[in-house]
Design a protein with these regions (language model features):
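Residues on the lipid-exposed face of transmembrane beta-strands in outer-membrane beta-barrel proteins
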Residues: 50, 80-86, 126-132, 145-149, ...
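Outer-membrane beta-barrel translocator/channel fold
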Residues: 46, 52-70, 93-96, 141-175, ...
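Transmembrane beta-barrel strands of outer-membrane/channel proteins
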Residues: 48-56, 107-109, 143-151, 193-199, ...
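Outer-membrane beta-barrel "beta-signal"
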Residues: 213-234, 393-408
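Repeated loop/turn-to-beta-strand initiation elements of outer-membrane beta-barrel proteins
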Residues: 58, 91-93, 183, 187-191, ...
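Residues that define the transmembrane beta-barrel architecture of outer-membrane proteins
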Residues: 44, 74-80, 118-124, 169-175, ...
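Outer-envelope beta-barrel architecture signal
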Residues: 42-48, 97-103, 137-143, 187-191, ...
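Surface-exposed strand-loop-strand hairpins of Gram-negative outer-membrane beta-barrel proteins
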Residues: 57-79, 117-118, 257-279
Length: 408
């Protein structure tokens, strides 16, 4: 029953994430500026794509090096991707603000050539890409990120899959970043090839959570649907925002697992623990694509500093704890934030340090990576992850945010 509830939560989250990507009538960002000329241009351009992505699995554990049922290395992967995307037309405000950006949803099939122990998962994800540099009239250097959920993993099981200590859940996050050479071979056709990085994990919601990392290549084709401008055609002038300060308020929550190491024994604390937090960040909008600022962060973690309140002297067996006082599980800090701004989505990164805390678990630096998905002009979904001390997995950050004084 608990597994079913977790699956339903992840499915609902994924639906909420991709819904704005396909709802092209967002009040937030699709105010259209029609021109009074005799030429009609589509306000939304659609495209379909197909990718093949071979990869090398980074060897992070003995399971991948041969300590598995096959008794051989697991170091190869292959995936097939089918994608739908749209771009805002050159006559729309967003098309003039972000003339080379596309976004959409994709479905992919992955194999690691170990179906019994890892499975052959299927991913559903949102994605977005844009141009980094125009190299030649028909050749550009682009980037593309993918973010979603992957289903159908074979997870760790003490009896049936005891050596797989990398995957602790049947559903895992799928994160990918690629850099591509994009060649316009025809008015309607593009060829793309490049390199990418992929990460699979469950966000510390289940143990084990070793995760899987892939370095690979990719080659694909894209077919534009309907009318499109020919390469070198004249487009309307770009729009540029005026620099200004906006304010982001985010409220989030999640659950997490917690393990303890003591007396040379590694133990998993039974059950899940709640996490809740709030961020308030004044952000200076430098240009169309970038804003940065300082965020005041507060977080309560129900699993923090439990080690100090353990009942008994041993780390093995049935672990029990007294409930720590609130001050031991609450922390406040400041973080530097930078954000890549695009239509529909923004990517936020932060590095911070707790200033008000009590206990080792809340001491020191923390790092944040978050995806913001706009639902209205000011309201956005927040899906993030937090690390502690630059290396320790901490918790998901699933919530809602609101932007004040947005002059875009």
């Amino acid at each position: 029953m608990i597994r079913n509830r977790n699956a339903i939560r992840l499915l609902c989250l994924l639906c909420l994430l991709v819904h704005p990507a396909i709802n092209v009538n967002l009040e937030a960002q699709t105010i259209i500026g029609q021109r009074n000329d005799s030429v009609s241009h589509p306000l939304i351009r659609h495209q379909l794509g197909f990718d093949i992505r071979p990869g090398y699995i980074v060897s992070t554990h003995s399971f991948l090096q041969g300590d598995n049922a096959q008794q051989k290395k697991i170091d190869q992967s292959l995936s097939f991707h089918f994608k739908y995307a749209f771009r805002f037309g050159k006559e729309s405000n967003l098309g003039r603000l972000f003339p080379h950006t596309y976004q959409g949803i994709g479905v992919s099939y992955h194999t690691f050539f170990s179906p019994v122990e890892l499975g052959n998962p299927v991913s559903v994800y949102a994605f977005q890409g844009s141009r980094i540099a125009q190299l030649l009239p028909r050749l550009s250097l682009d980037y593309e990120w993918n973010f979603g959920a992957s289903f159908g993993w074979k997870k760790y099981d003490e009896l049936s899959n005891p050596q797989n200590v990398l995957v602790g859940s049947k559903i895992n996050a799928y994160i990918n970043l690629g850099f591509l050479l994009n060649w316009q071979v025809h008015r309607y056709w593009k060829l793309a090839a490049g390199v990418d990085l992929t990460h699979f994990s469950n966000g510390n919601t289940h143990y084990p959570n070793g995760g899987l990392n892939v370095i690979g290549g990719r080659i694909g084709i894209v077919r534009a649907l309907g009318a499109d401008e020919a390469p070198g055609s004249i487009t309307p002038g770009w729009l540029f925002i005026k620099p200004h300060v906006s304010y982001d308020l985010v409220i989030y929550g999640a659950t997490r697992k917690r393990g303890l190491i003591g007396d040379d024994v590694s133990s998993l604390i039974p059950g899940s623990f709640g996490v809740a937090g709030v961020n308030f960040a004044p952000m200076y909008n430098f240009n169309n694509y970038f804003r940065a600022g300082l965020s005041a962060d507060a977080q309560y973690d129900e699993s923090a500093n439990l080690k100090e309140y353990r009942v008994g002297e041993f780390y093995s067996g049935d672990l029990k704890f007294h409930r720590p006082p609130f001050r031991k599980q609450f922390a406040m800090g400041l973080s530097l934030r930078a954000e890549l701004v695009m239509p529909v989505f923004s990517i936020n990164v932060g590095v911070g340090r707790n200033l008000i805390y009590s206990g080792d678990d809340t001491k020191g630096f923390y790092q944040i990576l978050a995806l913001k998905t706009y639902v209205t002009r000011h309201l956005f979904l927040h899906v993030g992850y937090q690390l502690s001390k630059f290396k320790d997995p901490s918790n998901l950050m699933l919530g809602l945010g609101y932007r004040f004084h947005d002059k875009r």
